[in-house]
Amino acid sequence: LIRIDVTKRNGLGQFGGRTRHLTLVGTAGNHQIDIANWGGDSFRRAFGLRSDWYRFPDFVAGGFWVAKTNGSVLALGSAVHYSDASSQTLGSPVAAMAVTPTGRGYWLVTVGGDVYAYGDAAYIGAMSGLALNAPIVGLAAHPDGNGYWLTASDGGVFAFGSAAFYGSMGDVALNKPVVGMEATSSGNGYWLVAADGGIFAFGDATFHGSTGHLRLNQPITSMTIAPGGGGYWFVAKDGGVFSFGNATFHGSRGNRTNRRPIAGMAVTTTGGGYWLVMDDGTSFPFGDAPDYVSNTAGPTVVAIDAVPLPPG
């Protein structure tokens, strides 16, 4: 036995609710256990467990960070906490975060354009003290770790360090505001996503599809690219997930009654799963995403980012 993954829960309660499917991963292959209800939980009965509300924290594979508007950062799984801005007096709330390519550091950016760097993340520049036409909503790191981009809700893009400017929507009237951005794996392009799921691709970023022509139940809150950059996911405020290109759909919260809005998502290093995270930090794993108790973060979570694959 290598590990045990909880691959489905009923979505009710702490760390995603009661267990409804397990994958036992072993050297000779995988074994699936489908669990219809408490009485039908063969795993629980075999080990004498008194509840079907369980998890396996000893099997740590991957992880993610969540950032809050006050600058605090919580690390889950294999993610490491490299300090944060919670002890500082911020000029404006934190809006986004980005992890360094090594996974040993991260940047935070505020809506006013201030940038804070931790771990092996280098401070390369910011929009501090400059008059912005619209608040900053997104941050994307260059793959070489020596630059980053900021984007504002009006589609304006600001490039620092090795990150080159490939265009923006700053001078275009948008149907809905931009809510996030992602960089291509080469660092020679980026995508912007709007609240209606409209996608704007620049440089070598490929357009794989969008929801800009659809009527969404709730606005998009963030996007995440698939490993290798051949696709991307959007997540909406109600937990709806939309996949494009080679990004695979592993499930969503779109058909559930959520007690809090979904703030964002993070994708596993394999691309075989993802976490959806509410604005109080509660996470819901899908696919091969491990299960973590992340609701200790508390309210005002605004950004989520996953531990990356090691360079090379």
Language-model segments: which ranges?
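Conserved, single-site charged/polar hotspot
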Residues: 1-62
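Trp/Gly-enriched beta-strand/coil motifs that build multi-repeat beta-propeller-like domains
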Residues: 60-312
